Amino acid sequence: MTDIERFIEKLPKAELHLHLEGTLEAELKLKLSHRNKIPLKQSSIEEIKESYNFHDLASFLEVYYEGVELLLHEQDFYDLCYQYLRKAASQNVVYAEMFFDPQLHTRRGISFETVIKGLIRARDDAMRDFHIYSQLIMCFIREMSFENAEETLNASLPYKSEIIGIGLDSNEENNPPIKFLKVFQRARQLGYRLTCHCDLHQKNTTTHIRQALEDIGVERIDHGINILDDPELIKLALERNIPFTVCPFSNEIVYPGKAQPEIRIMLDTGLKVTINSDDPAYMHCFYITENFNLAQKGASLTKKELVQICRNSFEAAWISEEKRNHYLEALNSFASAYD
């Protein structure tokens, strides 16, 4: 391990872009298949790992949704969330905001209550066991209707105190953010924080970024590297101090060899970049430390810049000022020890 890799490993981190359904590693997938008596096309962990290959967003979602079918019971959601938080804590993640997609489950007849109770229990147990604080962000699925998103928002209300924000994810094609404008407006009125995926090199991505910022008024952009294609959008993001939850390895899959240098351009432009792992189980188990290492090499990040990226994450987190100051003080103490 190099000095910079050791530095990255020990950095106190926050993760703001992580899909819980995207943390279904091969071992747990096989376990759930046996537990729930749902046969897989694969018969071994090695074969499952081999199946985690894709070349674009559509082929990724096909594999992703296959894994979702195995999640049936509260304990399944508990195991999924607890496993991620244990792994994150081992990589010095002290705070995490975790996306979950209830529509992927309710459309299969799984109740919202089953999903959320498993996640809440895992969140609380992980805090007790690993001292990692985490919160949940509920995402709407772009391919599904506005009406279904509205129903999902209504279903979330009994658990509003357990959900910090609302996001939008999945396939962008023909599913712009503006499609969900009214449900986002209502979510804001209810007190939810707002974010939105604007994925790398998808059709009309810069239009989607503009809609997310100007029409919906999100507080963060998930991915969002294509903002570099529009100087006016860059100006708007800088004026509003919009954080970008960038995911180096998933970007590398979509845009090989070029995604990491664009992180360098974003930083040099003054944009508020954070580094995250997205769907690590489906991306060669590149969790946050591996994503930091990839970005560091590809964007030639210094230790000072790595600390600033971590600082960006804590500043962008949807937490109390008391917690934010606590995390920033710990980060500053860590950085000072390396000066």
Swiss-Prot record:
Print the keywords alphabetically.
Cytoplasm, Hydrolase, Metal-binding, Nucleus, Zinc
HAMAP family in the record: Adenine_deaminase (MF_01962)
**SUPFAM superfamilies per the UniProt record, alphabetical:** Metallo-dependent hydrolases (SSF51556)
Chain positions recorded as Zn(2+) binding sites: 17, 19, 197, 278
**Origin: domain of life:** Eukaryota
Sequence similarity: Belongs to the metallo-dependent hydrolases superfamily. Adenosine and AMP deaminases family. Adenine deaminase type 2 subfamily.
Cofactor binding summary note: Binds 1 zinc ion per subunit.
Where substrate binds, per the record, is at 279
Q: Name one GO biological process term.
A: IMP salvage
Q: Which is one Gene Ontology cellular component term of this protein?
A: cytosol
Give its E.C. classification number.
3.5.4.-
- Residues of the site described as Important for catalytic activity: 223
Q: Which GO terms describe its molecular function?
A: adenine deaminase activity; zinc ion binding
> Under what name is this protein listed?
Uncharacterized deaminase C1683.02
Q: Name the enzyme's class.
A: hydrolase
The record, for PANTHER family, names: ADENINE DEAMINASE, ADENOSINE DEAMINASE DOMAIN-CONTAINING PROTEIN
Name the cofactor(s).
Zn(2+)
Note the Pfam families from the entry: A_deaminase
Q: Where in the cell is it found?
A: Cytoplasm; Nucleus
